[in-house]
Amino acid sequence: MPSLRRLLPFLAAGSAALASQDTFQGKCTGFADKINLPDVRVNFVNYVPGGTNLSLPDNPTSCGTTSQVVSEDVCRIAMAVATSNSSEITLEAWLPQNYTGRFLSTGNGGLSGCIQYYDLAYTSGLGFATVGANSGHNGTSGEPFYHHPEVLEDFVHRSVHTGVVVGKQLTKLFYEEGFKKSYYLGCSTGGRQGFKSVQKYPNDFDGVVAGAPAFNMINLMSWSAHFYSITGPVGSDTYLSPDLWNITHKEILRQCDGIDGAEDGIIEDPSLCSPVLEAIICKPGQNTTECLTGKQAHTVREIFSPLYGVNGTLLYPRMQPGSEVMASSIMYNGQPFQYSADWYRYVVYENPNWDATKFSVRDAAVALKQNPFNLQTWDADISSFRKAGGKVLTYHGLMDQLISSENSKLYYARVAETMNVPPEELDEFYRFFQISGMAHCSGGDGAYGIGNQLVTYNDANPENNVLMAMVQWVEKGIAPETIRGAKFTNGTGSAVEYTRKHCRYPRRNVYKGPGNYTDENAWQCV
């Protein structure tokens, strides 16, 4: 039996930890009385111990989250913040006990008014004082925008900025040391919101991680809407079943997988892939469940073509090959894309009965001319952000089934041209990484585990975690040359099958050997 003398250090450490926890809990429960900020109504302040599976009874059903596991002790502050006489955002701040002196804002997705609790849990668990808002409305529909321009303005830019202003004040009020640096982490609409901050509020963040950004958003809505006009409804002679999309995908891989030097089921650079479909067009008498008709082949060609406007101007680049299986159930399913239908019904035409099956590029012209509150988020002069010392890191999955990765390359080129700077100069403040085998923000067939979300987390090492890579860039001046991704054996949380270093654009990954394609050192950025 160990002596009491040997146990004393452990008992003392345990007592200190409990005392610290009690102090933090007491500080949290008394914090509500200290909050007196303009336009802020505190709904509640709760201490949440680490390990809690937090129930979320007030979260809108369409947001799809009823609970969230919280890994570290946090002080949870729920608020309503007025943004005008007729609008407000629902805002939460999660202030962790293991605070590292860093502030962070999360973003949103789609058209949704959903607080992303998984991002709050993820980043507060890493020691960030984190805020997240509902973008000014509740649920995933675009209907709240109908005849409510103030709500729309919250969605476009005001929600995140308001959350930042309030969140920074709360952070300084709660922690004596305040915060040393501020960060942003978001994907999809969250990626667009990150770039909106870069463009419109250059002093809000020191570092912005913006994934699969939905900028060029009005044209994105039109691009998503136009797929129905290509595929037609289920059963039409232009429609492809999921099985036919699988056949198409296999043929695309046969033609394009080996371009990067390795046949591993992953296309490292879809821009080099221009599928020729003649090999899978039906021969006379062949079973049409095993091949494509001429009209179906035309459908595929149209899907892999850019969208041009009524005057021939490029609106949106093509969908990248390699994403077709995942996109088939969402974008090519024989129904109008819901977000696009909502946008046109409730914002563009203010007509809930507008028929989304009748969409044409003439509608795209109407929508783009409106561009309410500059939703496009397509401004290419980000010199103010650069002058403020900010860093922006963007990534895009090359299997993205919702937002073409080609659009991120298009914006990168626009910034370089507008600011008249070459890639090596852009690298000083703006870096873009293409993530092969990553679908929309997460998932996919490749090494998508880059730590951009809780579900893609592998570890907190900056070499393996895109958020912590940004922290290292901002705080130590060490900019990431590659982003290492993990390929999981059986989805998120399973063992790591292999890792791959994803290249900084405009470089691309090429297999050189001599090791197997699962060896990250067998690949080179060229």
From Swiss-Prot:
Q: Which InterPro entries does the UniProt entry name for this protein? A: AB_hydrolase_fold (IPR029058), Tannase/feruloyl_esterase (IPR011118)
Its Enzyme Commission number(s) read: 3.1.1.73
What UniProt keywords are attached to this protein's entry? Answer: Calcium, Carbohydrate metabolism, Disulfide bond, Glycoprotein, Hydrolase, Metal-binding, Polysaccharide degradation, Secreted, Serine esterase, Signal, Xylan degradation
- Which residues make up the binding site for Ca(2+)? D257, D260, A262, D264, I266
Return the Pfam families for the record.
Answer: Tannase
Q: What class of enzyme is it?
A: hydrolase
Q: Which GO terms describe its cellular component?
A: extracellular region
Q: Where in the cell is it found?
A: Secreted
Q: Identify which residues the record assigns to the active site.
A: S188, D400, H440
Signal peptide start and end residues: 1-19
Q: Does the keyword Metal-binding apply?
A: yes
Point out the glycosylated residues in this chain: N53, N85, N98, N138, N246, N287, N311, N490, N516
Q: What's a GO biological-process term for it?
A: xylan catabolic process
| Catalytic activity as recorded in UniProt | feruloyl-polysaccharide + H2O = ferulate + polysaccharide
Annotated S-S bridges? C28-C75, C63-C114, C187-C441, C256-C273, C282-C291, C503-C525
Single GO molecular function: feruloyl esterase activity
Describe its function.
Answer: Involved in degradation of plant cell walls. Hydrolyzes the feruloyl-arabinose ester bond in arabinoxylans as well as the feruloyl-galactose and feruloyl-arabinose ester bonds in pectin.
The UniProt family comment states:
Belongs to the tannase family.
Q: What is this protein called?
A: Probable feruloyl esterase B-1
Where does this protein come from, organism-wise? Aspergillus flavus (strain ATCC 200026 / FGSC A1120 / IAM 13836 / NRRL 3357 / JCM 12722 / SRRC 167)
